[in-house]
């Protein structure tokens, strides 16, 4: 059973509310997001692009641009090597368009997920050399490509790295020894010597900052770099970066830009997803548009997604966009089957004792391993690796919980992998098939997770009676957007809510509506999108079958609930009303 926690962070909420013209509840939520002090609150509410740090603070940023501008002047052949996910596609798009604007002789290559794997490899370096490429520029990859970059340097090539992933290291007797490549310049805010104040940038944001420095260097108006702000925002949300600090500013600016997008490919994708440009928010980036871009890298080639955004003909853009949507539909079906198989294995093969799950699904397409890992992590609240058979052994992806730094834990058994990399919350790996069971054993031996770490935790912003909620307050919550990682939609809790009626609706009978009455007698319209059968089982066990039947018929009963809820304004036939979405109950 999940534990409910109320955020108890202190501040003078009345003073904050008065100073910034917001309700005390809104002020409390902002404090719960770790925003402290008037300057920080002002940036949270009113942050502008002009408030973000100078990209010149990025270690090697100016050096990279000095080299790149000279290569452009020399008409040297430059190749951008990106990645096959949304961040890699957007990073590549930004650099290709910007370098062409700067007069560069530039092309691009996005690795094939199955044939090439993640990031740089020797094959891609050799192909670039055969094609007469002088300079390789990486984006959203390269920080861990130590051997591959060494190979490129042996061939006499220039290598410029832009990345945002964790810097690889060896753990020698508890001391981290960071690895460095022989690249001519490395730009990554996670480097120890990097003085850039905000570290949580995605690859596209790092690439965009290089564009700003490049335009500054060669005399192009820096304002032109704002042409890419919607791509930066798209990648930031799609790559599940924290929507805090600078990222929050970038995403807000990007959403404003996309409401008036001129990109033919983006317009086509919006049309195929039945979304009006002026209605796009972070949810659409993360859960509708982003998965369509990622689906190409998973099941086909991410080059197709990049071609969509580079496209200048509407007919072609609509064709590609419709293909992306169809691929994503296929991905959804494959994912559902993979999750079902993983659950069967967990329940059959004594995985309950494992604190870290390593599940081998040889028949699952390697591109959806990460999605399946995320679903299994959500179900069991355990760090999860999903492994699958590949052309040269086993590949996999991991998704973690807050209490477990996945990449650091993998470093403790790095000898088992042929390749690995990632973040605290996610990772990718390759290993020989004979190491699969050993990996499961070792990663669990090293895990120091406690029983409490593995209990799901529900964080409540404010314990607030539903009676306090008003249309005005819910409307005000829009100042908290965009919502996403580290800035979730606010949730509240109330108790002693009596169920007067409950009934199932929806085309697939997968939505539960409830009429509730507060302890003060206020009638409430509520909705629940979770597991309805589990909810019904709880009601029967806790209150009895008679009460359950009475509630379904709208008759008096003894069912009283405590709920975690999120209020919103429901619009039906142009009429607005308050609706309470139940997240959890007990």
Give, region by region, the residue ranges found by the protein language model.
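Hydrophobic helix-and-loop "lid/oligomerization" segment in the mid-to-C-terminal part
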Residues: 5-135, 154-156, 174, 182, ...
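Short, glycine-/Ser/Thr-/acidic-enriched flexible segments
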Residues: 85, 142-144, 166, 191-192, ...
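Short helix/loop capping segments that flank catalytic or ligand/cofactor-binding pockets
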Residues: 89-90, 147, 170, 245, ...
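Mid-to-C-terminal polyanion-binding domains and interfaces
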Residues: 70-74, 316-322, 326-360, 412-586
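Catalytic domains of riboflavin
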Residues: 1-3
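Active-site cavity-forming subdomains of large catalytic enzyme subunits
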Residues: 126-204, 208-217, 227, 244
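Conserved beta-strand positions in the Rossmann-like core of class I SAM-dependent methyltransferases
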Residues: 107, 160, 539
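Short, well-ordered strand-loop elements centered on a beta-strand within folded domains, enriched
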Residues: 175-178, 183-185, 392-400, 523-527, ...
């Amino acid at each position: 059973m999940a534990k409910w926690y109320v955020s108890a962070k202190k501040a003078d909420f009345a003073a904050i509310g008065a100073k910034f013209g917001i309700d005390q509840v809104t002020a409390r939520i902002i404090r719960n997001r770790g925003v402290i002090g008037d300057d920080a609150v002002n940036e949270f509410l009113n942050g502008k692009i002009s408030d973000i740090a100078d990209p010149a603070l990025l270690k090697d940023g100016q050096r990279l641009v000095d080299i790149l501008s000279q290569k452009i002047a020399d008409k040297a052949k430059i190749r951008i090597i990106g990645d096959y996910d949304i961040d890699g596609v957007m990073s590549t798009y930004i650099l290709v368009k910007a370098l062409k604007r700067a007069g560069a002789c530039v092309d691009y290559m996005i690795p094939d997920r199955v044939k090439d794997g993640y990031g740089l490899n020797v094959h891609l370096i050799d192909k670039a050399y055969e094609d007469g490429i002088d300079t390789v520029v990486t984006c959203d990859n390269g920080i861990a490509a130590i051997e591959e970059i060494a190979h490129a340097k042996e061939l006499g090539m220039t290598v410029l790295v832009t990345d945002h992933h964790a810097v690889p290291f060896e753990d020698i007797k508890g001391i981290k020894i960071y690895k460095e490549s022989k690249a001519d310049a490395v730009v990554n805010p996670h480097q120890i010597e990097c003085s850039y104040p905000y570290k949580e940038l995605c690859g596209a944001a790092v690439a965009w900052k290089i564009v700003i420095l490049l335009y500054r260097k060669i005399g192009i108006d820096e304002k032109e770099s704002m042409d890419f702000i919607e791509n930066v925002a798209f990648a930031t949300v799609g790559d599940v970066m924290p929507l805090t600090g600078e990222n929050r500013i970038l995403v807000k600016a990007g959403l404003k830009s996309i409401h008036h997008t001129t990109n033919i490919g983006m317009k086509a994708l919006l049309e195929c997803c039945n979304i009006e440009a002026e209605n796009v928010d972070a949810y659409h980036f993360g859960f509708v548009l982003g998965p369509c871009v990622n689906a190409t890298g998973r099941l086909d080639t991410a080059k197709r997604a990049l071609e969509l955004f580079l496209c200048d003909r509407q007919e072609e853009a609509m064709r590609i966009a419709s293909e992306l949507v169809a691929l994503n539909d296929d991905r959804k079906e494959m994912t559902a089957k993979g999750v079902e198989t993983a659950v069967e294995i967990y329940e059959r093969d004594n995985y309950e004792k494992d604190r870290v799950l390593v599940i081998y699904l040889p028949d699952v397409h390697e591109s959806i391993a990460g999605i399946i890992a995320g679903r299994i992590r959500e179900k069991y609240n355990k760090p999860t690796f999903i492994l699958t058979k590949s052309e040269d052994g086993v590949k996999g992806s991991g998704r973690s919980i807050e209490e477990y730094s996945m990449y650091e834990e993998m470093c403790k058994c790095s000898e088992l992998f042929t390749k690995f990399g990632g973040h605290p919350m996610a990772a990718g790996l390759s290993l020989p098939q004979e190491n699969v069971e050993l990996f499961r054993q070792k990663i669990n031996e090293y895990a120091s997770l406690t029983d409490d770490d593995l209990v799901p935790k529900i964080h409540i912003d404010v314990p607030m009676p539903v009676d306090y909620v008003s249309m005005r307050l819910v409307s005000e919550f829009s100042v908290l957007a965009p919502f996403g990682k580290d800035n979730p939609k606010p949730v509240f809790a109330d108790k002693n809510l009596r169920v007067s009626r409950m009934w199932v609706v929806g085309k697939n009978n997968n939505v539960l509506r409830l009429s509730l009455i507060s302890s003060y007698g206020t009638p409430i319209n509520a909705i629940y999108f979770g597991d309805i059968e589990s909810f019904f089982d709880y009601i029967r066990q806790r209150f009895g079958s008679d009460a359950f039947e009475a509630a379904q018929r709208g008759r008096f009963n003894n069912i009283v609930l405590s709920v975690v809820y999120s209020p919103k304004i429901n619009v039906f036939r142009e009429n607005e009303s308050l609706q309470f979405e139940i997240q959890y109950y007990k």
